[in-house]
Amino acid sequence: MTTITRWVLATVAILVLAIPAGAGEPSQDIVGFAAHHEFSGVITKIESGMLFIHTDYGLQPRTVSPNKADRVGLHNAQVGETINLLVDSGNVLIDAASTDRAFPDHRFVAGTVRYADPYWQEIQLSTPEGTSTFEVDALAGNKLSVLPEGAPVTLELDAANVMIDVHRGR
């Protein structure tokens, strides 16, 4: 065997072993369970009920809509107040809270998709307890478009029982 042939065989063997078998296949996960990041920010402006939040460490400024502010208990927020923010792996804001409230009031519901509203308003799940319908947060709605009926999912719900995130599989 020549030196070039050995070199080619060794290179091919390394490439075959280095590339995982499913590298070309898309992931089944929409968002991993541990992919949430919590940080705080300061409200710099409130305009027409919209909260504008400045965050440290060069992170992009955030906004909280009037509907979300009411739902998460920030309807009496003031400029200069520090609040906690929770984002998913796609850097999308999924929850906000005053600093005296943490995020452990989230709950998870597992089931199969029975119906996902094309306008992202609600999702229906078949669970062992029966069919359940949940309102969908406006920022989480785009995740519904990739969920076919019958797909096994786990929904993450906030304290108001609104879907804020979805995870494929159970």
Predicted regions located by residue number:
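Short, flexible, surface-exposed loop segments at domain boundaries
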Residues: T2-V8, V12-L15, I19-T63, N67-T131, ...
